[in-house]
C-alpha cells in the first residue's frame, strides 16, 4: 500500500473493515484527491480537502498520528474523543455502570493523547450536505482555557469561548463536553 501511494499515475481501490489497513493509507490530501472514502448511512464521504473541514495541518498531523487504534473511528457508529489514558479506560467503565455497552453500540473511545482532538473531530465535519451521521463527542477538561481573567463564567460562555479558541463552531454531529474544572 505504501509503495502504491507513492505512484502518481496509479489508482487502486481497496475496501476494508480493517483499522490495520486504514492506518497505512493516507487520509487524503489537502486537495480534492481522495485516499479514503468513508461509507455511512447510505452515503459516501470523501476525505479530500474539498469535502471536509480538515485543514492542511490536519492532514499532516493525521498522516503522522492516525495509528491502528485511532483508525477505528472510521468504522464506528459513534466516537468519543478523549485526551488520555485515564479517560480511555474510565469512560467505558462508567458507561457500563450506567448500563451502556459501548462496544455493543459500536461506539469507539479514541485516545488522541493530547488536546489534539480537533484534528480528529474535523474528519466528521463536512463542507456541505449531507452531514455525516456519525456522532462525535469531545471529552476534555479545561486545558484549552477560555480567555478569562479568572472571572467565573456560565458553562455556556465557557463553551463558546473554547469553541472560539478552536477556531470554528461545531456542527450538530460533533459535541464538546467540557469539564467544569481544570482537570477531569
Where is each model-derived feature located?
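H-loop/switch region of ABC-family ATPase nucleotide-binding domains
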Residues: 15-17
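Acidic, divalent-metal-binding catalytic cores of TOPRIM
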Residues: 2, 7-9, 22-24, 28-184
